[in-house]
Amino acid sequence: MAKKIYLSPAAHGTDNPTKCPTKCGENVHCNAYMDIVEKRLKELGFEVKRGDKSKTGNTALQSRVAEANNWKADLYYVAHTNASGGRYSMTMCWNDKASLEKANVFHKYRKCVASHKVVTRADLYEIKHTAMPCMYDELFFHDNAEDCKWFHNGGMEKLAEETVQALCEILGATYKAPNTTDSKVNELEAKVKALQSENDSLKKTINVLTAKINSAKAALQ
């Protein structure tokens, strides 16, 4: 029977700005990263569910955890990027032996970054309230321009594949590397989706500004 993985990319109520080479946000590039992870997991035979992108903030956290618990997922995987000036990758989990063993598998495969650490947390909603083990990644620091450039120029794909390797080992599945053509297609698809998300955000901003302009014009008449 296929193992079940629930995916939860960043879903902040107000997306966090980044120093990425193109206009981006934490929610945007974490979803692009999770597109790659999701596709690869399905290729390898996992059952996958993913948090609804239309929901953000506490509503997203609560609905995702409830959905994963009701589905009886085998593992809950979160992907965020960090801020505050560091330069490392981090996997967080509940402070118990089983969770730490799984987080250390992430540590084993996290080779594309200079530094990675495992940290226990008891205060994060998704770690605290999931019925299954939760692995909560802070992939890199999005307030570091150099690391942002790396992530958007091949680093995203490397991190995603290392995550897939770790999840295969944790859940006892056979890992198979993607062929080169598929990897390039994944990379291009992720970039297209990121640009589409940016375009949607710009359209919303334009609509808001247009409404304000029309309101101001009406007041002058």
Predicted regions and their residues:
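A short, glycine/acidic-enriched catalytic loop
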Residues: 14-25, 82-109
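Active-site-adjacent mobile loop/cap segments within catalytic or ligand-binding domains
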Residues: 6-9, 14-17, 69-71, 75-82, ...
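Acidic, low-complexity intrinsically disordered segments
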Residues: 173-197
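Catalytic cores of processing enzymes, dominated by hydrolases/peptidases
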Residues: 95-141, 205
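Soluble non-cytosolic domains of exported or imported proteins
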Residues: 24-32, 58-62, 97-100, 150-158, ...
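Active-site histidine-acidic residue metal-binding/catalytic motifs
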Residues: 1-63, 71
